[in-house]
Amino acid sequence: MSGDPSVVGIVGEWLDGAGIKRSDTATGKVNVRLVERIDQAVVNQEEAYNLTVSQEEISIEAVTEKGVYWAVQTLRQLTDRSTREVRIPCCEIIDWPAFGIRGFMHDTGRSYISLEEIKREIEILSLYKINTFHWHLTENQAWRLESKIYPQLTSPENMTRYPGCCYTQEQVREFLDFCRKHHILVIPEIDMPGHSAAFTRTFGCDMQSPKGKGIIKELLAEACDLFAEEPYFHIGTDEVHFTDPDFVPEMVALVRSKGKKAISWSPGCEYAPGEIDIAQLWSYMGKPKPGIPSIDSRFRYANH
């Protein structure tokens, strides 16, 4: 096997898992190469790849490590191990995604799901080139993300469903490492100021009160630091009556001060271009707005 040292390990892991032995004297070759661009890919060059399988060679060309990873996922799908021999059909595949974010969400605020289960799902979904996990961490029922500043948030008495079940910061860091290995972007979400009964039970105040706003700013800053390498943070803002017109702008400013882009549900808080970075459409009432990038998730959610 030859190629760029930064990416040959991805292919080597697949070879080992497929039971394909590596040898310097083997007649079949595997070549991995990073290139400036994949000419046929009209969008999302960073995920594009050119995979060629012949009788003599497996060749992968990609612009980034992520493109190599998706090429290997395609090889996993092509590999036939139904007999004692490992078979891969000869082919040439030039592939790139139409959409930069291809994701799934778990509402673990309502219903706790173990990280072991989520990891299994990520391993499966990454085979199909799903590249984003939206992690809804807080709800009326529970606050699932450990806080070192306010540990009482995850106390069993402040949860009405799956009491005591939460994700520690150490677990989150390990999980993020796992996601990076599978080239999964994680979008964490703390829903605010609505869907926050767990917050109110804990502190005896609403997020939009002066006391509550001070607390949620500390929590949001702590969470942004925990998810330091993730480029986005979701702040919710749906299904709530706003009593403090400065609440959302201040939260967006805090997220941006941490070097991240802020995402908000739509319908939710109303924004003009520049006031939010991405709107995530969640129902038929959510409409794309000129000047505001959007993620289209309409008609794809089931509250549970």
Which functions belong to the PLM regions below?
Residues 1-99:
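Contiguous, structured surface segment used for ligand recognition
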Residues 29, 139-140, 192-194, 269, ...:
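Conserved beta-strand edge residues that scaffold enzyme active sites
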Residues 46, 55, 99, 148, ...:
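Short, solvent-exposed loop/turn segments at the edges of secondary structure
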Residues 64, 237-304:
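Catalytic-core regions of glycoside hydrolase
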Residues 68-71, 114, 304:
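Short helix/loop capping segments that flank catalytic or ligand/cofactor-binding pockets
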Residues 99-258:
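Substrate-binding cleft of carbohydrate-active enzyme catalytic domains
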